[in-house]
Amino acid sequence: MASLADGGKRRVSYFYEPMIGDYYYGVNQPTKPQRIRVTHNLILSYNLHRHMEINHPDLADASDFEKFHSLEYINFLKSVTPETVTDPHPSVSENLKRFNVDVDWDGPVFHNLFDYCRAYAGGSISAAAKLNRQEADIAINWAGGMHHVKKDKASGFGYVNDVVLAILELLKSFKRVLYIEIGFPHGDEVEEAFKDTDRVMTVSFHKVGDTGDISDYGEGKGQYYSLNAPLKDGLDDFSLRGLFIPVIHRAMEIYEPEVIVLQCGADSLAGDPFGTFNLSIKGHGDCLQYVRSFNVPLMILGGGGYTLPNVARCWCYETAIAVGEQLDNDLPGNDYMKYFRPDYKLHILPTNRQNLNTRLDIITMRETLLAQLSLVMHAPSVPFQDTPSSSQATEAAEVDMEKRNDPRI
């Protein structure tokens, strides 16, 4: 295994849709696509674009979405507008409730909603296709990572599940996909989509909640291929590192994934208004650094994060990790300097929030997850069980998967 200090160069392909920052969830909505534009501007200011390939993603279309989502739901997303939601006809309110759109505060209807879905999901699907063609070692889409969306319901500020769609794309060429996430909430719908297959292993480090219990470990052929680390308030860098490194190290040894998807939700950072963890940007980035060190094809996605300047800081820093560059803590001049007042620094300090995860908690959870991994078949071989029926993967794609050569790593 490569060391944590691995700074070798990788072929990095970065996907960015220039219009992404124009989409607006509405007044008092915490999710702001503008954060992607600010992140991008900071990346340019640090000259990181000189170390990677910049791509405009292909916009996804309805046929892409239907590989996971229901046709009725996608047709609804195509037609709903801020004007139509005010229609008094009972069918309108029924559909809004049915598809969980404009019902709760985390699924508002806004102008050009479907185009927004096409943009952020297109970035993730394009990134997956880039890895499939072996044209990059690392592919990045910070606009992606909407891991809560169900087959026929919006959820968690997302409307289509680009993570599931990207993994389905990767399964056309790669035998085994390891999905890891380090955001604050559990990646419930990614786990749900692949809980009964051995072709995808999911590992989630998240706040303890209604889903993602440590006893939830998959079903059928996917039994033991879902790993969950439900953590308490105040999680700090040291505690996460003590859990993340041994668990991921063992997962890599046992499962031998051919490609990794890392969801880097920034709502696990200290000070996030909806998160109660206490991670620094460096501690968050250390997880990416460790995953990168294995030199396995890697997709990096965004996710949650509701303190805009800290999200931009974090994802810019992690872009630097991806390309193998170190950044000065003093921010360079950029178009959004006002967001970074008063210190204009890259890194943030943890708060004084108490870490409720005791040393014994971390040790116990680590040993439980390592014991679960001992029950996983070592590097399951093709033929695998079929990709979940929700993917509607084509027969041709499965044939391609069987015929492919081992990926370049």
UniProtKB/Swiss-Prot annotation:
Molecular function GO terms recorded: histone deacetylase activity, hydrolytic mechanism; zinc ion binding
Subcellular location, record wording: Nucleus
Feature: compositional bias, Polar residues: 384-394
Stretch list, region Disordered: 383-409
Superkingdom classification of source: Eukaryota
Catalytic activity: N(6)-acetyl-L-lysyl-[histone] + H2O = L-lysyl-[histone] + acetate
Amino acid composition bias (Basic and acidic residues), ranges on this chain: 400-409
Expression tissues: Low expression in flowers.
The protein's required cofactors: Zn(2+)
Gene3D superfamilies reported for this sequence: Histone deacetylase domain
Cofactor, free-text remark: Binds 1 zinc ion per subunit.
Database matches in PANTHER family: HISTONE DEACETYLASE 7, HISTONE DEACETYLASE HDAC1-RELATED
Official protein name in the record: Histone deacetylase 7
